[in-house]
């Protein structure tokens, strides 16, 4: 199953994920704290990964804050065991598992106040 239509819903373990939803990366991923959006969901035989969970395709926004940029560069430098700059970190077409993202519901959450 491939879901691409804006506002189309996909339910997984009692949580609703919709195409176009604003999301934030959780502590379960290298993208923790980054905002983005869902643009595609794949499940079953249409998945690209071998994970037991659906593949949720996200585009993330590059951080503006220099401390956040440095933190992201450090995380990916450690992950790849070589220095990585922001320009070298993939922020679009990132396949995430459901536990790696949280849907952002309110304006306060979008501004990072919750």
Label every PLM stretch briefly.
Residues 2-114:
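Basic/aromatic-rich interaction segments and small domains that mediate binding to polyanionic partners
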């Amino acid at each position: 199953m491939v879901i691409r239509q804006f506002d189309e819903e996909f339910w997984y373990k009692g949580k609703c994920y919709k195409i176009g939803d604003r999301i934030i990366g959780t502590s379960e991923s290298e993208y923790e704290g980054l905002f983005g959006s869902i643009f595609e969901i794949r499940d079953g035989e249409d998945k690209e990964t071998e994970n037991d969970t659906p593949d949720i395709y996200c585009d993330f926004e590059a951080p503006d804050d220099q401390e956040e940029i440095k933190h992201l560069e450090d995380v990916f430098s450690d992950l790849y065991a070589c220095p990585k700059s922001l320009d070298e970190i993939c922020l679009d077409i990132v396949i995430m598992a459901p536990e790696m993202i949280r849907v952002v519901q309110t304006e306060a959450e979008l501004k990072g106040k919750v």
